[in-house]
Amino acid sequence: MNGIKVGVLPWGQNVDWPTLRAVGQRADELGYDSLWTWDHLYPIQGDWQRPIFEGYLILAGWAAVTSRATLGLMVGANTFRNPALTAKLVTTLDHMSDGRAILGIGGAWFEREHRAYGIEFGSGFGERLDWLDEAVDLMAQMLRDGQGTARGRFYHATNVRNDPPPVQRRLPILIGGDGEKKTLHTVAKYADAWNTGGDVDFVRHKDEVLRRWCDEVGRDQAEIERTLGMGTVIIRDKESDARSYYAEIQRQHPGFSDQPKIGTAEQLADRLRPYVELGFRHIFFDASAPFDDETLERFVTEVKPRLEAVRAA
């Protein structure tokens, strides 16, 4: 858990499958530690009335053409699937990938896709986080004990079996989110990894809250891997070249306006230094079609070694 790991999250929107498959292969060949994708039914960047692929099937497709990187949703929408089914899905992915699956899960937030697909969205985020807590409890039982029982307010199951078990002795559960009253409590109880993002002060505060929850539930906080999402990254030696590529992203994703992290490999490593010093050792960034091979290659060959040096200092 102590080494630096880097990952990439290729968007499943506004892209064809051969291109999406190829970027997964390329990342794996370059030595990325993890491959992620979204779990959304409508695009979340730019115009929502555009094409997007389903998350678990993207991961299954990558499992067939990769051999190294772990595979997970960043993060799965708990509302989309019965939690017992989610445990079965990620277990199947673990077998398809020879033990490389991660169960990424969160409370879900994009109301438009829920309404369109007729998926229950609850009365608010607080209720969905209550659902998440019950769901992760059941999923953890199934993944770790081979069967699970749920007698909560929202989910009901009696000795539901998960057979075959995962390939991994402990298939990791990653929970994304920052809520101090509910999400981080759930992370402390069940998660093997936690995902967050934001400026250093924000992340430091959330990490402190998580540590307090770990103390309260009797959990060693060091057991929980910290992961950091950077959003879109463009590595170039000249800012004008980076801006030119950003314009290509905007053309392919109309309405996309988020500001990417732009800089040289050294500048990006310097930007990440305080997070590594804080204990975040698994860092990933978003990648959108048209996929940027220069950034993909330089992040793993130039940024990662610099972060390893920070960790070792």
Predicted regions and their residues:
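Active-site-adjacent structural elements that line small-molecule/cofactor binding pockets in enzymes
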Residues: M1-A313
